């Protein structure tokens, strides 16, 4: 089946099993890992993220001392996801990731977004690291990817002429 082939390619025929004790041994083991991560994601969303959603909307982020701080519920949500090892899901294990194919990651993202779409957007910023992984050099990989997998940093920065990062001031014209 197609998912079996995807796993073989992503896992490079399961060669990480010699170096990482949590790497799958074969296709069945990989699918079991994905199922467990989906279960863990469901537990976190049901026990932490969904109950925090309304309070996060009411509190909102805060700006002080030149920094934006997330609402306390958002911080709790992020802490729970990081503690469960759910950052850097698609990144290689050598950087602290889970080396998952995009399919189980996307399934987790859907579960998270169903509980709190705003938090789903924040948590899924981890997919931005795919660009650095694909096009960055080894120095960039070693400096940034482990920190993202550990939940220490992540952002998405936008810029447009005459608007900077102010998305509401961006204009789009089609022809």
Can you name each region flagged by the protein language model?
Residues 151-159:
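A short, Trp-centered hydrophobic/proline-enriched beta-strand micro-motif
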Residues 173-174:
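Conserved small/polar residues in nucleotide/adenosyl-binding loops
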Residues 95, 158-162:
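Short, flexible loop/turn elements at secondary-structure junctions
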Residues 120-138, 164:
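N-terminal glycine-rich flavin-associated loop
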Residues 123-124, 142-148:
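Beta-strand segments within the central parallel beta-sheet cores of soluble alpha/beta enzyme folds
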Residues 1-120, 139, 143:
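Amphipathic, small/basic residue-rich leader segments at the start of a protein or domain
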